Amino acid sequence: CIRDSVYDPAARTVEQVVGGIAGASGLALDERTQTLYISDLGSRCIWSAAASARGLTAGGKGCQSSFSGLPGYPGALALDEDSTLYISYRWAGSSWLERHAGSTFLRGVALRLSESMQENLFSLPADGIRAEAVSTASGSWLWSFSGKPQGSSSALCPVENRVYFGIAGEKALYSARV
């Protein structure tokens, strides 16, 4: 299991924030509410916990699944000033991965494949959802972003009325108006 930790440069220590995550691939901090959001590839969900918390376990007291049943495997996260959480998707949902979700060995093998092999096996379809936006205040889904570029969204950044996307394997930056 992966542990999300925090480094204290003054004390030169690392403290565990959340354990029991099967593939932490993105973090976002809501400074207003001091909530930390963590994308989990293995569980296809977004966990949330207080930013000041230490020693939590995903799904346990103080660390709940805020958004689950996602259409793909979440990657990068970003949060705008209105507390809208943007979730990028690395891969489309995969029946093979879902069937073998209980096997830490097979899941580990899939996560350690080369990026090009992962893209070939689990790539998002041309018209698939690359990213979504959800209100953390209400839990309502605001936007879905789909598009023609092949590859998964490896980075995203909301700026005013646009969202910028980095697509794995592409030599261009994409954007969408919101």
Predicted regions: what they are:
Residues 74-142:
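Loop/turn-rich, solvent-exposed surfaces of beta-rich toroidal or solenoidal domains
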Residues 20, 30, 36-43, 87-91, ...:
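Conserved beta-strand positions in repeat-built beta-propeller and related beta-rich domains
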Residues 22-24, 43-45, 53-54, 71-75, ...:
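Short, catalytically relevant binding-site loops at active-site mouths
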Residues 153-178:
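Blade-level signature of beta-propeller repeat domains, shared across WD40, Kelch, NHL, RCC1
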Residues 4, 44-46, 93-95, 131, ...:
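Structural signal for beta-propeller blades
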Residues 13-18, 62-67, 140-146:
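A short beta-strand motif characteristic of beta-propeller blades
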Residues 3, 17-35, 69-83, 128, ...:
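Beta-rich, blade/repeat-based domains predominating
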Residues 8-12, 50-54, 135-139, 177-178:
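Short loop/turn segments that connect beta-strands within beta-propeller blades
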